[in-house]
């Protein structure tokens, strides 16, 4: 599990965190965090905390993180008020329950779509990098409609096969 936190500057995450995301951007097309759980905390004395948290949540989504919980907090005083304390306690309890459950969630249709587009493009060699082709050359990844060991129902498995067939050149 990870906790990602950022104060809000100019209605967005910090430049340092953005640089980290840019540095790790290969995870958008070589996902590997299928079993990870992430808590995102954004803070501000003004506005933009929800938007910044949602941006980070979207990044984690494309990296195929199993579970993401956001905790955007706006406070205008030196001390946290009771409302913010209640939010923090509620979200912390929810995240703790998720961690203790050890549950692996079924991926969304969007995750299955992106997984199979990248899988097909890499197997085809469609202008993707050498590292992408090497990642997707793993036999287990080549043969599955989503990462091995992740639960996926019949409808989503069929959807994954369809998407792969549309993008894969035989």
Set out the residue ranges of the language-model regions.
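Short beta-strand elements in bilobed, periplasmic/extracellular small-molecule ligand-binding domains
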Residues: 65-74
């Amino acid at each position: 599990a990870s906790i990602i936190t950022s104060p809000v500057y100019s209605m967005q995450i910090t430049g340092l965190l953005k640089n980290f995301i840019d540095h790790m951007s290969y995870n958008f097309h070589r996902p590997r965090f299928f079993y990870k759980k992430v808590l995102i905390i954004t803070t501000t004395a003004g506005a933009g905390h929800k938007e910044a948290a949602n941006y980070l949540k979207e990044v984690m989504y494309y990296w195929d993180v199993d579970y993401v919980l956001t905790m955007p907090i706006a406070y205008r005083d030196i001390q946290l008020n009771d409302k913010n304390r209640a939010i923090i306690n509620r979200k912390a309890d929810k995240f703790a329950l998720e961690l203790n459950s050890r549950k692996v969630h079924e991926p969304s249709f969007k995750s299955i779509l992106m997984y199979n587009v990248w899988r097909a493009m890499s197997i085809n060699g469609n202008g993707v990098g050498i590292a992408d082709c090497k990642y997707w050359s793993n036999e287990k990844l080549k043969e599955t409609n989503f990462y091995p060991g992740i639960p996926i129902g019949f409808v989503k498995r069929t959807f994954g096969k369809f998407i792969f067939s549309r993008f894969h050149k035989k």
